[in-house]
């Protein structure tokens, strides 16, 4: 689209091989990959009285499984920030097939949060500590008028950068 540009930043992470297995008895370690529109959220991390991605996911897990583990994210996004592949991990004791958990969470979560993948992973996996790389994408729309359909997803800037 004319006037748009994309800046992609790739940050390699340090290797961490420590075992971060949860100590919940008879629990399986889960990994979810999420996509979300963060416009209406106060970031990733639970904040009292504020809607957050982590809080919505924890509440949805409670409604689906009767368990409320605190999902650990591969990073914490700020208020209004979107994600196309945020990874989270948590322990669950409920015996549920991955496809069923994915489907149930997507029916329960707000439309602005979607689970793209649900997998049972080794106990040593931890979304934050096992990450090896992160990619950040900044979209700048360089024109005098930004189309409303893009306004939530770009920085509108008509001045030289």
Question: Predicted regions span which residues?
Answer:
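Structured-RNA-binding interfaces characteristic of tRNA pseudouridine synthases
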Residues: 5-161
């Amino acid at each position: 689209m004319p006037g748009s540009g994309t800046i992609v930043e790739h940050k390699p992470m340090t290797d961490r091989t420590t075992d971060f297995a949860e100590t919940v008895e008879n629990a399986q370690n889960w990994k979810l990959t999420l996509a979300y529109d963060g416009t209406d959220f106060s970031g990733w991390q639970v904040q009292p009285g504020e809607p957050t991605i982590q809080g919505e996911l924890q509440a949805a897990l409670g409604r689906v499984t009767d368990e409320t583990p605190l999902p650990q994210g591969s990073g914490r996004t700020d208020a209004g920030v979107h994600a196309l592949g945020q990874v989270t991990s948590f322990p669950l004791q409920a015996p549920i097939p991955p496809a069923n958990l994915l489907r149930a969470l997507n029916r329960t979560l707000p439309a602005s949060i979607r689970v793209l993948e649900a997998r049972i992973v080794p106990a040593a996996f931890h979304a934050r500590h096992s990450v090896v790389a992160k990619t950040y994408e900044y979209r700048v729309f360089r024109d005098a008028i930004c189309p409303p359909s893009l306004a939530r997803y770009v920085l509108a800037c008509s001045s030289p950068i």
